[in-house]
């Protein structure tokens, strides 16, 4: 008798439901419904409402926290769901983390410091994750080393390059700026992809920055900025201080316009600060943290804010995984 393989499906917790639905549509996959039942005292239970036995399941959860659901609570709910799916006999449980909270703490900077990203990796593995797909994690090397299960590290850079080529003034003299030394490699990759696809000359600059107890200092700008458009690129905007500091330095260096492109915006206050900064002409972000930006803020931004969906990137990745196609091309050029 031929073996029957049940179809793969996407699973999403309520706080990530819109993102999970969008990823399922992009991937052409069905959904596995779950029950989320709260109890008094903050306790809850999670269980699949259909058979999970033998199925490959893709579990979507952004770990960007809010006042109502902090990152720690979202992580705990994800862990409980993974254990429930494992107990229900799911064959594979691949976690999709559009935003990986706790990933910034990937090394020790003081005695007895925790390496929190590794602790989270151990929790996910213990709960039954069989694979993980992340997006623009703060330190890709630390991300890879933290896990023993297979991982895929996606990048929003090709999407951002495509957006800039088709929706921004890509014909201007442009310099890609890293707001700190640690982001130079990211800025260099963006510059190379943009130059290759536009056929034009794209400059590279970086800002020397120091951070101590949350205070950003330093401001030496290395690179050609005067008379050019500066595109400040970063993986994450928390408070907005670093990006605003870099934008001001670019203006002082003679940039005619300063644009900002960032993947993750886990705090609404950070986006609000960018919108309120007079030195910044335009801001491009992704929705990796889900629908956290209030409509009032989006209206206040008018045409100064572009919001790029990450569901097509995750959906295309799942399609390629399920058809044994390579994922690497998605990291080099966004499909037209």
Regions found by a protein language model. Name each.
Residues 1-336:
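PRPP-associated nucleotide enzymes
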